[in-house]
Amino acid sequence: MHTMAEIILTTLNARYSHASLGLRYLYNNLGALQTRATLKEFTISMRGADIVEQLLDKQPKIIGFGVYIWNITETMHIVQLLKSVAPSVKIVLGGPEISYEHADQSITALADYVITGPGEHSLRQLCEQLLNGQRPLDKVIPGISAPLKQLTLPYSAYTDEDLRNRFIYVEASRGCPFKCEFCLSSLDKTAYPFEQDRFLEAMDTLWQRGLRHFKFVDRTFNLKIASTVRILDFFLQRLDDETFLHFELIPDHL
């Protein structure tokens, strides 16, 4: 017996060992719709027809894709296949690769909706409308930059299998104040920290579940020295031979 899901949140990772943090934010912020949704992750090496078959097997009404630089070509192929065999399924795109130059992207024309920027609140609102039979007129929907304290953290959506077998990504802050020309994050206005007690409580839960390798996706981990020291102290108090932290630093704050 197959489990059905009206909403599927999916992406094509570069390889199985990468677990999508973005999908888990979206899933954990669906509110009452979460029971009607599921996560499905694939890799860019999989056959498009196999991915489409697995997606449609759950008989979804909405499929949301996370689009990144490493998967946009493969994702466009998947969306083309979906629209040819299941045109009634609503396709929603989000992610950094289509948030800024969506008008010039071929994949945008194939989709029903595109959410630019932060998607947690905007996706939930869009799904509520679509499942209630409403059809928003605007194809491109700006993401809502709500205060981070309003977000449900994503970490409970990591399964025990994820913790055992995959890279687990975490973030203590969002955004970046720097304006490096080569980086999409230069379009951010500034960096916003998550409330630290709440963040460290979530890290402790992951630690208690057995996680020892933490990969921080913060654009600049040591932007605020006091916050950085507190996070490092948290891990130093729990340090064992398996502990591994990965983060990006700016040298002038060392």
Which residues are covered by each model-predicted region?
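Short, Lys/Arg-enriched N-terminal segments with co-localized hydrophobic residues
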Residues: 1-3
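Nucleotide-activated donor-dependent transferases that construct or modify glycoconjugates
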Residues: 5-15
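N-terminal [4Fe-4S]-dependent radical SAM core
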Residues: 7, 131-172
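Structural motif
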Residues: 12, 67-68, 117, 249-251
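Tryptophan-centric aromatic hotspots in well-structured domains and transmembrane helices
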Residues: 16, 70, 100, 124, ...
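Short N-terminal binding/cap micro-motifs at the start of the first secondary-structure element
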Residues: 16-22
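Glycine-rich beta-alpha loop elements in corrinoid/cobalamin-binding modules
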Residues: 22, 26-29, 33-149
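Radical SAM [4Fe-4S] cluster-binding motif and immediate context
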Residues: 152-254
